[in-house]
Amino acid sequence: MTILEELGLLKMDFLGLRTLTVIQSAVQEIERIHGIRLNMEELPENDSMVYDMICQGKTEGVFQLESGGMKQFMRELQPRCLEDMIAGIALYRPGPMDFIPKYIKGKNAGGKVQYTHPKLEPILENTYGCIVYQEQVMQIVRDLAGYSLGRSDLVRRAMSKKKAAVMAKERQNFVYGNEAEGVPGCIANGIDEATANKIYDEMIDFAKYAFNKSHAAAYAVVSYQTAYLKYYYPVEFMAALMTSVIDFPNKVAEYILVCRQMGIKILPPDVNCGMYGFSVDNGAIRYGLSAIKSVGRPVIESLVREREENGQYRSLKDFMERNSPQMNKRAVENFIKAGALDCLDGNRRQKMLVYQKISDSISQDKKNSLAGQMSLFDLVSEEDKKEFEIRMPDVEEFGKEELLGYEKEVLGIYLSGHPLENYRGMMEKTISAKTSDFQQDEETNLPKVMDGQKVIIGGMITDKTIKYTKNNKVMAFLSLIHISEPT
């Protein structure tokens, strides 16, 4: 891993971030709808409204800032500039997190920060007396112990690779100097032994999870850009964000809840309006067609292309004819269950009862055409052909539970409602814990509900497994969803 560096060559790591695609898609959608081409490199750097949103912890979907712990940290940190964001991202990791209380205290102290030695003030002033970046360590060893630029970089490398033996050896040089290697050391520069060792101890603690500022800065810029898009163009941003996770129903469901909290309406998938991914439709977000299970990208792209070239679909038969043969029966059935064909005549139950007959009729017509055969249907006028059309049966729509069940089956979430909606008021008054409260916290690795704690839960059982212990006692494992959880 170090051969390139030892040869003096530049080594670079390129990270493929999904967020960059989200930004690009949002910018394209903004241009399509508003006629504005945003230059993300020229955004106002210190927009107070954007920082207000971040300080309130409303950062779901914002790069690096959407976890529960990070949202709480932003509420405590109250960042008002990019420098604060950079420090926040660098601090919020194992190791540096221990410095968060000290950093926040220093930030709120109004300049009353105490430094281990006066020479540290110009180096640590921007981070309120805390060592946050590798670059600060490099400057400390140069300014306090007289290291050269090259040697300070060796210390940085030792930290980044967590080379404890090298760091321990370097303590001697830092405190006492090394005349043979041209290092004066702290004592020669007027810093007493105890203070020098204390400073080095702090650097050792930091070195366990050393982070370079350039990395944190690059991430902070992307964080700010996504926060800016979320604040000023929430519909376009959330549509792009949900498209980026379209293959993960649980994540889509999470963002749908966020949209509803933001007052953004979610429209069902629609073959006459929808696109491959989530799209903006008159200030609302239209569900992406590719979120429907068992329907591949080529089918969706062909469907949209056919609609754009030859107009909207007029009926179920028209839809199936124009998309045959790439649209198989399973795909049509899932479109019906998802509500993507509600724009065409007939309810979902009617369509479920006739789509196979229509498919068989289309297949037979194609066989006759290939064989050069004519049917009775070909001999009548266009007006009389309507008498031969497969008609919708006279049946009522599925019940609410069935409709929701089909949506869950093909979309992975409940979209048009929730099976527990009628019990919302009672559940909100009665229950004391949600299903998410049993999940581990990302910081403490502990759930909100502890072992032995008595709580009242409420929800719908979606799965049950019965098992027997070695003593032949019955055990049951239940899967439960809460009313606030679409999945």
Name every feature range the model reports, one short phrase each.
Residues 1-484:
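Noncatalytic, beta-rich nucleic-acid-contacting surfaces in large DNA/RNA-processing enzymes
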